[in-house]
Design a protein with these regions (language model features):
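Short, acidic, small-residue-rich periplasmic hinge/interaction motif at the N-terminus
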Residues: 29-33, 37-43, 72-76, 86, ...
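Short acidic/polar hinge/loop motifs at secondary-structure boundaries
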Residues: 58-61, 166, 182-209, 297, ...
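N-terminal periplasmic accessory domains that precede
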Residues: 91-96, 141-144, 163-166, 178, ...
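Outer-membrane beta-barrel translocator/receptor signature
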Residues: 186-188, 201-203, 214-226, 230-281, ...
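Flexible loop and strand-edge segments within Gram-negative outer membrane beta-barrel domains
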Residues: 275-296, 302-363, 369-388
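Membrane-embedded beta-barrel scaffold of Gram-negative outer-membrane proteins
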Residues: 362-376, 481-483, 490, 523-576, ...
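Gram-negative outer-membrane beta-barrel transporters
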Residues: 449-453, 547-548, 553-556, 576-658
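C-terminal beta-signal and adjacent terminal beta-strands/loops
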Residues: 600, 649-657, 680-759
Length: 759
């Protein structure tokens, strides 16, 4: 009897305990739909379960107190919720998860000039979010691209640190830079116009590698970079992003959103960059980093219209004062021949917008205009230039049946360019003759859906250049994808043309270290390109995502315009290539995300860029054969701490020498720039970040600037033909030359900054 009573008592106690045991239950959804078979568990415990066919879950016997509730599922981003469960509580919680960033149907516009999901685009488009660039914060768009595979910011001068953007080994003039689809950064601004775009206003960057001339015109031969700015409606109310380095650099981005009118929202952004601390670590007597004082103001107004028809107007103003040179240089020596300095004043404004006509058909009018004024001296050589560009474009998008999606457009571009060089003077050099170019054009594109998994894109463009006449640029693209869109093959081909302007594209032509010579009239370059792209997405059983993107490319040039630095050390000779040039290679990008939160982005490009002239083949100058990039990130969710490790690696490049006696290396070494950053997130508003740039402290050799101690060649002896004569004081027959440059002279440095955002 006592035994029976004891059993009953024990059962009652156990039952009472069970009724008081804590539990957590709920439903996991995404966009209102249940997520089946998701993993739901308490971090740091063995308590876990999976959702059923209705997305439901229940965790039993949960210890009371605070926990991290983790949800993972194939194709979805890891989600962590903080819970606090009291003794005896049966907690109910519904969890919304988001698709994995690599799984999301990103909307792109650069490939076909209209909004489509990335997986549906017949043209391969790479998309890089603002978060990607935050892993290695930089003060300019130019520097931010250093961790994009196949893209390299190339410095062109050791003194003023100007640069351009190379894609797949092709120089900057072959890359078109757009802002919201408009050709803003071009011509004169390709040298100094890539700075001052406020990073806080950038939504994403889209990169197309290969010709896009059919839709965007002549400069998109090598590829394009399209900077997509945020829409006012989706931007935060206000944000501040400020960081500085122990070299004395200070960069500030400020943005604010406000209602301009009842139906218009405005997004105002200001970028300010200041560096006024001359440093000469390599002891060559010259500044390692150009001193800069720059301010940029950007404003974008979005109008709310019926049927969500787009209407926006944006503008930007940039002023910059930069100089580099002898450490003893001051503004009083500007333009003289006592102490060498390169001083550049830039005044630039831009305006662009889009308006969809209020009619039944989808007809968009786009426009842009910009003015670029440069007042500069390179030693005692002045270079003053004015450029005005006006552009408008009208496009009509029409679907015909279920298979044809037509895009028809007309465009006109006006370019005015004037400077103080022989490029804009009459034949006798006594009368100024600005260069004015009219470029009307028509283009048509048909995207044909052959089947659910096959798509064909046909396009052609006709331009009439007021100087060079008729120009045709056709293109063809084909895309196949598997039913689940996890395997995609794209094949594309097309041609392009380009009219070169030496003084707006090649900084070496301005330095005064060499005279410029033209060998005959420069004809437009033409190119033919073929590329193949394969994209694969893999989802493993342990919620790991692997994205692979492989490409092969081949571009064949005729009439290519290349600067000849080697025939005469005192000249840069420009002429059309008497032969051909080839750029070919392969690339691979990998995007791997583990359920633990670790993320890896890595890529490698192997390429061969060569020139063949008069039966002789040689490598193109300043072009690497191997490039690697990586970005590794991990977030410690519980403490709100993230770590990012980024870097790049470049193979040897052939460098420009001044002659056979030049003792500088003919090829650059293997070199790498690596960075690390820690970010502490305090709440939804505050972030503190800091780290180290150029961890390996890599810099080029100290003798990169030839004869930096004699920049005006006052102690150089020349013969009657203008050739340098070796002397005891100049045994290598050198002249002053700052164009031997392949990497920044700025070594290791620390940085710290903060972000404050009001949403």
């Amino acid at each position: 009897m006592r035994f029976t009573i004891s059993l009953i008592t024990l059962a009652l106690v156990v039952s009472a305990y069970g009724s008081l045991a804590q539990s957590v239950s709920g439903v996991v959804t995404s966009d209102g739909e249940p997520v089946l078979y998701a993993n739901v568990f308490l971090q740091g415990t063995q308590i876990g379960t999976s959702t059923d066919e209705f997305g439901r879950f229940e965790l039993k016997n949960v210890p009371s107190g605070k926990h991290q509730l983790v949800v993972t599922a194939i194709g979805y981003a890891k989600t962590v919720k903080s819970i606090d469960i009291a003794a005896g509580e049966a907690l109910k919680i519904d969890i919304e998860v988001k698709e994995h960033a690599a799984q999301l149907e990103e909307v792109v516009v650069s490939g076909t000039m209209k909004e489509v999901s990335k997986s549906q685009s017949a043209v391969p488009v790479e998309v890089y979010s603002a978060q990607f660039f935050r892993a290695n914060p930089t003060p300019s768009v130019f520097e931010s691209l250093q961790n994009v595979n196949g893209v390299r910011p190339q410095l062109n001068c050791n003194v003023c640190n100007t640069g351009d953007i190379h894609i797949n080994g092709l120089e900057g003039p072959y890359t078109m830079v757009l802002i919201d689809g408009m050709p803003i950064v071009s011509g004169l601004s390709t040298v100094y116009g890539l700075t001052g775009i406020p990073q806080a206003l950038i939504e994403r960057m889209e990169i197309v590698k290969g010709p896009a001339s059919t839709l965007y015109g002549s400069e998109a031969v090598g590829g394009l970079v399209n900077i997509i700015t945020k829409k006012a409606v989706s931007a935060p109310l206000a944000s501040v992003d400020m960081f500085g380095t122990d070299w004395g650099e200070l960069n500030t981005d400020v943005s604010v959103k406000f209602k301009a009118t009842e139906k218009a929202s405005s997004l105002l952004g200001v970028n300010y960059f200041n560096y006024q601390n001359p440093i000469d670590r390599n002891k060559d007597g010259f500044t390692d980093l150009t001193l800069q004082n720059r301010i940029s103001v950007f404003d974008k107004i979005d109008f709310n219209r019926k049927a969500n028809r787009p209407f926006s107007i944006a503008g930007r103003y940039v002023y910059e004062d930069r100089w580099g040179g002898d450490m003893n240089w001051t503004p009083e020596f500007r333009g003289g021949d006592e102490i060498y300095g390169e001083s550049i004043y830039t005044n630039r404004w831009e305006m662009f917008g889009i308006y969809q006509l209020p009619i039944k058909e989808i007809v968009n009018f786009q426009f842009s205009a910009n003015s670029h004024k440069q007042n500069s001296v390179y030693g005692n050589t002045p270079y003053n230039a004015n450029q005005y560009i006006g552009f408008w474009q009208l496009t009509w998008n029409k679907s015909i049946g279920r298979k044809h999606d037509l895009l028809v457009g007309g465009a006109y571009r006006y370019t005015y360019y004037d400077d103080n060089t022989p490029a804009t003077s009459s034949g006798d050099a006594s009368v100024n003759q600005p260069a004015i170019t009219h470029l009307p054009g028509l283009f048509v594109q048909d995207e044909i859906s052959l089947s659910e998994n096959n798509k064909l894109l046909l396009g052609t463009r006709y331009d009439y250049n007021s100087i060079h006449g008729n120009i045709f640029t056709p293109r063809i693209n084909y895309k196949w994808n598997s039913k689940n869109k996890r395997n995609i093959v794209r094949i594309g081909g097309g041609n392009g043309y380009r009219v070169a302007n030496v003084f707006t594209e090649d900084h070496a032509a301005l330095t005064g270290a060499r005279t410029v010579e033209f060998n005959g009239e420069l004809l437009p370059e033409t190119s033919w390109n073929v590329n193949v792209n394969f994209e694969k997405k893999i989802y493993t059983d342990n919620s790991t995502f692997i994205g692979l993107d492989a490409s092969a490319f081949y571009t064949y040039f005729t009439n290519r315009i290349l600067p000849d630095y080697e025939t005469d050390p005192n000249k840069i000779i420009y002429s059309n290539l008497n032969g051909h040039s080839v750029s070919k290679g392969i690339s691979l990008n990998a995007d791997v995300s583990w359920y633990s939160g670790l993320k890896l982005l890595a890529g490698v490009t192997l390429m061969d860029v060569s020139v063949e002239e008069n039966g002789e083949k040689f490598r193109q100058l300043l072009t690497e054969s191997v490039q690697g990039v990586w970005s590794v990130g991990y977030t410690f969710t519980r403490i709100g701490l993230s770590i990012d490790y980024t870097g790049n690696l470049y193979g040897p490049m052939r460098l420009p020498l001044l002659g056979e006696l030049d003792d500088r290396a003919e090829f650059s070494p293997w070199w790498s720039i690596q960075n690390i950053q820690l970010t502490k997130r305090f709440n939804d508003r505050w972030e503190l970040y800091g780290g180290v740039k150029n961890l390996l402290n890599f810099t080029p050799p100290a003798n990169s600037i030839a004869r930096s101690f004699d920049p005006f060649d006052k102690n150089v002896v020349f013969d009657n033909n203008g050739q340098v004569v070796p002397t005891p004081d100049n045994p290598n027959a050198l002249t002053f030359d700052p164009s031997y440059v392949y990497a920044p002279n700025q070594g290791i440095r620390g940085f710290i900054g903060f972000r404050y955002t009001i949403r």
